[in-house]
Amino acid sequence: MVGELYRFITDFGVIEGYIIKEEPNYYLIKLKNGYNIGIKKSQIKEMENLNEKIKVGQFPKRKPKGIGNLGFIYTGGTIGSKVDYLTGGVSAIMDIEELLAIADLPYDIKIIDSPFVKFSEDLNPKDWVEIVKSIERTYKKGAEGIIVAHGTDTMHFSSAYAYYALENPIPIAFTGAQRSSDRASTDAVINLFASSIYANSNIGEVAIVMHETINDDTAIAIRGISARKMHSTRRDAFKSINEEPLARIYYPSGKLEIINKKYRKRSDKEMVAKPYLDTKGALIWVYPGFDPSILEYYRNYRGIIIAGTGMGHTSKELIPMLKELSKDLFIGITTQCIYGITHPYVYSRGRELSKFATYLQGTPEKNYVKLLYVLGKESDLDGIKKEMKRLP
């Protein structure tokens, strides 16, 4: 009975769906539109077996389109998860072919790679390196554009690292989902579709491609170092911080509209991966009552990003410790406001800090990722300072 299609004549109408669980007093039914409902047995007048069976959560295989030469890298996350209908939790991992089948992409995926499968909250900086190496492998196998399926919680960290670590990139779209891919409400279909359009475009940049609004008609491509997850659950969780998105992709037409005229075009030069990394860097958010002695822990680090208040400030109590640390390690100042700029000369506190710290633009997360990249590239403090200022 479980997994079979039934027609139920009930007190409130006729319903067709697959039985995915039977309890003493009710059936749990999966409707053909993907939603699940419960029907009390006492409300069923008649039920008919329609002689069709499924495995719960099973998807058809993808069909070749005959155009395109894209690569697909799977790293885990909600986009590749299924709901376990027995527990109600999101846990099981889908087969990659199932994931690609649900989106019915307009271009063919020719190369598939998966360096690891993790939820993004479990990723560490060394995983960013593995993603970049996977991108490099996929490119060398002939991919002309690449989609990276990734958990959304820390996707903006990974996209920022890939942005710095790849020279002359082909179009690379990081994407994910806020709803698991077997749900009727999933955002994975539009996100994967839009990512394939971006990956086949003439934009030579690493980007995050996700829903533009809560509706299913457009997605946006955001530069990898400018994207940030700004909502925990909404489909349009990712926003472009302090600059316009690169492009808008329309669904289902597939039209790509350039928004940011300062985009980098796809290059004829070979893409080169330079995955520099040193994890002896930290991101520290200051707050009222922050104890300066906390900074003692980081004395043996090589760099610190301070997410300051307002335009990049800290309390006066932190200045002596930060000044002392700056003799041996890089101190960068950014703003925890997320939107807006830092500036060292508007307030006197900024002038004090700028005597030994470097003011940086962009999000705290982007500057933390940039720091770890630069620490892996440069060996001395002067070189670190110059490179942190030079890179966007």
Curated annotation (Swiss-Prot):
SUPFAM superfamilies assigned to the protein according to its UniProt record, in alphabetical order: GatD N-terminal domain-like (SSF141300), Glutaminase/Asparaginase (SSF53774)
Pfam families: Asparaginase (PF00710), Asparaginase_C (PF17763)
Annotated GO biological process: amino acid metabolic process; regulation of translational fidelity; translation
Enzyme class: ligase
Record key words, sorted: ATP-binding, Ligase, Nucleotide-binding, Protein biosynthesis
UniProt GO molecular function: asparaginase activity; ATP binding; glutaminyl-tRNA synthase (glutamine-hydrolyzing) activity
Source domain of life: Archaea
Record's keyword annotation contains Ribonucleoprotein: no
Gene3D superfamilies xref list: 2.30.30.520, 3.40.50.40, L-asparaginase, N-terminal domain (3.40.50.1170)
Active site residues according to the UniProt entry: 78, 152, 153, 229
Ranges of residues in domain Asparaginase/glutaminase: 68-391
Catalytic activity: L-glutamyl-tRNA(Gln) + L-glutamine + ATP + H2O = L-glutaminyl-tRNA(Gln) + L-glutamate + ADP + phosphate + H(+)
Assigned EC number: 6.3.5.-
Signal peptide: none
Keyword Kinase assigned: no
Annotated InterPro entries: AsnA_fam (IPR006033), Asp/glu_Ase-like_sf (IPR036152), Asparaginase/glutaminase-like (IPR006034), Asparaginase/glutaminase_AS2 (IPR027475), Asparaginase_C (IPR040919), GatD (IPR011878), GatD_N_sf (IPR037222), L-asparaginase_C (IPR027473)
PANTHER family: 60 KDA LYSOPHOSPHOLIPASE, L-ASPARAGINASE
Function: Allows the formation of correctly charged Gln-tRNA(Gln) through the transamidation of misacylated Glu-tRNA(Gln) in organisms which lack glutaminyl-tRNA synthetase. The reaction takes place in the presence of glutamine and ATP through an activated gamma-phospho-Glu-tRNA(Gln). The GatDE system is specific for glutamate and does not act on aspartate.
Family classification: Belongs to the asparaginase 1 family. GatD subfamily.
Subunit architecture: Heterodimer of GatD and GatE.
Protein name, entry field: Glutamyl-tRNA(Gln) amidotransferase subunit D
Lineage of the organism: Archaea, Nanobdellota, Candidatus Nanoarchaeia, Nanoarchaeales, Nanoarchaeaceae
